[in-house]
Structures are given as C-alpha cells and as structure tokens.
Regions:
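Activity-critical C-terminal alpha-helical subdomain
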Residues: 445-494
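C-terminal substrate-recognition/cap domain of FAD-linked oxidoreductases
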Residues: 27-43, 250-427, 435
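Conserved, mostly hydrophobic/aromatic
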Residues: 75, 216, 472
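N-terminal flexible segment immediately upstream of the FAD-binding catalytic core
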Residues: 1-73, 91-121, 271-280, 325-351, ...
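FAD-binding subdomain of flavoenzyme oxidoreductases
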Residues: 111-267, 491-494
Length: 494
C-alpha cells in the first residue's frame, strides 16, 4: 500500500466531492468500495471476500465531461489519487487501488451513442458506451466496428481505448488504435482536450497515442470516434486443420498473412489449449483456425489462399461447422463470469492468461522457452492442470502468443497471487523480453508487469517518463499503473 499524500482525510474527500457532483453520484458503501479496489487480476481473492488493496474513499459516477473535469481538478489540487474505470473488465491490476483514500472515477453512466455517420463511416460514443450496444446498433444498419474482444458483452469504450485493446477479428479490422479517428479526454488539471476527427494528417506526432493506451495514468477518456465498416456476416467461411506441432502452425499463419490476405480470424492452438476448446476432434494435435470475412469475392479469394497454404503442409482437415459452433460461444458475458466464480469457490481451481508479442522468427522460441522453464523451474508445477498457448492476432511482421495456465490452488486464497500467478507471469514476461518481443500485447501493463516497464522500453522509456511529468506532474492518476512505483503491484526490478 502507498500512503496518501493528500492533506485531506477520507471523510473530507467525500464531503468535498459532494459539493462537486450530486450525492447520488457518490458511492461509499463498504462492499462496493472493496469490490472497486481490485480487478480480475485478483479474482480468486475477491470471490473469497479477501480485499488486500486499500479501500477507496469513494466511487464517483461521472455523468458528463464536465463532471470528470471538476473531479480531476479537485483531486489534482488536493493530491488525491484517482483510478479511472468504465466497464471493469481489466485483468492486469490496472484498476487496483494502490494508494490509500483513492477516488475511483467511473464513466459508465456516460453511455450515449452520440452520432452514427454513415457517409464518413464513423461512430462517436461516450466513454461508458457498452461495446455490445454500439455493435448491435450498427449491425441494424449493416455496419460493424470490427472490434470484438471476448469481453464484448461487458466492455465499454473508455476502457477499450485506455488499455489499447484488440478484438478477435483484428487481422482484418485492426486493433483499437487502428480504429480510433478522434477522441476527447480530460487531463489531471481539468483541461479538456479534443483530438479532431480526420482520416489522416501529417501535423507533428500522432497525439492520439498520448491518450490511447494510457491506462488512466495520464488522463480520463470521455469520448471516442471510431471507424465503422460494412458488414457481410452471411459470407463468412470457416476453415481449420490439425497439424503436428506449433512450428508448422506458426508457418501457416505467416504464409497466409504475409501473402497479403487478411482473414478476420487467424489462430493457432497448442495441443493442451486445443483440448480445452476442441477435445471432440483435436486428437492431441495443434489446431489452426481461420475465418474469411467480407464481400463475397474477397472471401472466395481468401478461402482459396488458406486452402492452398494448408495443402503445402501435412494436415488433417476439420469440418467448418465445428469451428462455426465453437466461435459462436467465445465471448465472456455475465453468465460465464458467474459460473467461473462458482467454480473458484467450489473447486479451488483457477485459469489465467498472459499475452505477449514477437516477430515471426522469435515467437516459437519464446513459446518453447516458457514451456521449458515453467515445467522445470516453477516450484508449484505439480499443481498445474493445463499449460499451453495460442496465437490469435497476426501481422505482417509477427504474431502474438497467449500463454494459458490452469492450476489447482494448494494455499490460502490470500497467497494465491504470490504462489502461482506472479511467478508464472514473470517467466513469460522474462522470456518475451529476452527474445526481443514485447511483454504485453493487448491487456495493458497494469500494476503487475511494471517491474519490467523499463526493460520493455529501453532508452525510449525517457519519452514515456516525460509524458507523465508533463501531464501528471502531481502523480495523481492511477499511481503504480504503467510506471513502476514501490508499494504498487509487485516490487520494481533493476
């Protein structure tokens, strides 16, 4: 825990907030505050009623950009730490309250779809607009955002932008940073900044990227404009094959993508991970999955190329209907989260992921190194019930790798993080960096990968540090996220 540097006591903070927003916008219920002190990084502790992060002073539900500006200006003047949030789907501790008497600033009530511009193919929404609602609205018009993370039923736009998120159709549509046209954000001193909506410009550095991916450590995203695309769901074609090893699967992904084709889905599952999804047909092999999407002529050409590449490698064809049925049930909504909570209570068992990225030459070596180190060095390896991985987002220059690990928990709930999650996370991050990859692909640094932030950025860290000094000199924005700070997450290294 980090002590508050504010001269105000928590009661004084709450009293002052009540002069800035209406009383019904302030929540001080103890259970709500405890739940607001963590995110899904500590899901096992939370489900057992253990909240070891400092309890926030209050949750403030902003209803306008002006609310956000006034709350931040107050916090900045009085040195009160603020944790921004919207959909609460974070998984890396970015929503954890590391500082005593933090104010959690919630944008979920700012949920309007402001404009749908079919001529210029863009939609403008407030930070709390649920992605599922936006997508459903667009689908009625024959359009799509193309953004479909597994958190889609729960995620909201402010968090999607702030964490630099990505969706399951990224190989075709891109990640959130490829979709954002313009946005509005509020900085700690209450300054409202708008980046205008233009298709492209050459007017200095692209300042959208000061805001995109800032994880609430620099500013609060209040409004977003993203591209939209025409949607042709009836044209989708599904392809899959079984292959003998990850190296073959990686090469198949690479050949399709670098050949100039953009299937919306391009995935590779290790045998262990495949068994979680495809046990009815995977037979202990790796599974390669593609979805061709778009206008009929593009789908036909993409499908032909996928089949051509498959035929260059030993493989067993998988029936398309099996993949279509699987893909229709990938997203995580409230029902799956409640089922996971029930399982954690009853079985003391847990599953997590850590995702990295690397070039085509390195990703296989990273995968092999992680598998070897976890199996030979991780002290609790005997508690693992599954260790595997999958690639789900590919590029001209490389791909990502999700490491997936499930384990039985043989300790008190309060000890789970340190015994299991932190050391497994560390091995994956270390191997990604050792091989020249990135320690995080799309979940954000949060508060538990900060020990490696300097190693991730190297000499470019000075630029990142300069942004913090310029925009948050008082250090009130989500302390301990992105930027390593003693007392937040785990101890800084090096």
């Amino acid at each position: 825990m980090i002590d508050s540097i504010s001269a105000l006591e928590r009661e004084q903070i709450v009293e002052a907030l009540a002069t800035i927003v209406r009383p019904d916008q302030i929540d001080t219920d103890e259970q709500a505050l405890d739940e607001a002190s963590v995110d899904r990084f500590k899901k096992y502790q939370a489900v057992h009623g253990i909240f070891d992060a400092p309890r926030p002073a209050a949750i403030v539900y902003a209803e306008s950009t002006d609310d956000v500006a006034r709350v931040l200006a107050f916090a900045n003047e009085n040195l009160v730490n603020v944790v921004p949030r919207t959909g609460r789907t974070g998984t890396e501790g970015g929503l954890e309250t590391s500082v005593a008497d933090t104010v959690v600033l919630d944008g979920s009530r700012m949920k309007a779809i402001l404009t749908v511009d079919e001529r210029n193919m863009q939609v403008t929404v407030q930070a709390g607009a649920p992605l599922q609602v936006v997508e459903d609205t667009l689908r009625k018009l024959g359009l799509t955002t193309g953004h479909s993370p597994q958190s889609k039923p729960l995620a909201q736009y402010g968090g999607l932008v702030a964490t630099r998120s990505i969706g399951q159709f990224s190989t075709l549509y891109g990640a959130i940073e490829d979709m954002v046209v313009g946005l509005e954000a509020v900085f700690p001193d209450g300054t409202v900044t708008r980046v205008k909506n233009v298709p492209r410009r050459s007017a200095g550095p692209d300042i959208r990227h000061v805001i995109i991916g800032n994880e609430g450590a620099l500013c609060f995203v209040t409004e977003v404009t993203v591209k939209v695309f025409r949607h042709f769901p009836d044209n989708n074609e599904f392809h899959a094959a079984l292959v003998d090893d990850m190296a073959t699967g990686i090469e198949i992904l690479r050949e399709v993508v670098v050949g100039g084709f953009r299937p919306s889905v391009a995935r590779l599952y290790s045998p262990e991970d495949a068994n979680q999804h495809f046990a009815h047909f995977s037979n202990g092999k790796c599974v390669v999955v593609f979805v061709a999407e778009g206008p009929a002529s593009i789908v036909a050409a993409t499908s032909a190329e996928i089949q051509r590449v498959f035929d260059l490698h030993p493989h067993e064809k998988v029936e398309p209907a099996l993949i279509e049925a699987w893909f229709d049930n990938l997203n995580w909504g409230p029902d799956k989260i409640e089922a996971e909570k029930a399982a954690m209570r009853e079985h003391h068992h847990l599953g997590y992921t850590t995702e990295i990225s690397a070039d085509w030459s390195s990703v296989g070596a990273i995968y092999d190194a992680v598998m070897h180190r976890v199996r030979t060095e991780f002290p609790a390896a005997s508690d693992l019930t599954m260790l595997g991985g999958h690639s789900s987002h590919s590029y001209q220059t490389g791909t990502n790798m999700y490491f997936v690990y499930d384990y039985d928990i043989d300790c008190a709930p309060a000890e789970e993080i340190e015994k299991y999650h932190v050391p497994l996370n560390a091995i994956i991050v270390e191997e990604a960096l050792r091989h020249g990859g990135s320690m995080v692909h799309h979940h954000g640094i949060g508060k538990y990968r900060t020990p490696w932030t300097l190693a991730e950025h190297g000499s470019a860290y000075a630029i990142l540090a300069g942004l913090k000094q310029q925009f948050d000199p008082n250090g009130i924005m989500n302390k301990g996220t992105i930027y390593p700070v003693a007392g937040a997450g785990i101890a800084p290294r090096g």
